[in-house]
Amino acid sequence: MSRKRIRWTLRALRRLDEIGAYIEKDDPDAAARVVARIGTAVDALAEYPASGRPGRIKSTRELVLADIPYIIPYRISRDVEILTVMHAHQQWPQVL
């Protein structure tokens, strides 16, 4: 199986920045760890794109991070498209 290219949507990049900025207010080191953890998890999707569970929204998958409360919805096509980054307790949108 060949590695897929990871492609972040603008929405996903904005959410990652927002998450980092929010956590950084209280703990800059924790913010760096969370953002790095999300990045590492996403990078692994290049090699194992089907590792996430089937998504709640049609044609998506969800990478659940067990050690931090974030879920990464994504789509697999020629590339792995990162749709957004969601807190586990956040209300899900109808579409991504």
Curated annotation (Swiss-Prot):
Organism: Sinorhizobium fredii (strain NBRC 101917 / NGR234)
Transferase found in the keyword field: no
Residues annotated as signal peptide: none
Name of protein: Putative toxin Y4kP
PANTHER family linked to this entry: PLASMID STABILIZATION SYSTEM PROTEIN, TOXIN PARE1-RELATED
Function: Toxic component of a type II toxin-antitoxin (TA) system.
UniProt keyword annotations, A-Z: Plasmid, Toxin-antitoxin system
Family: Belongs to the RelE toxin family.
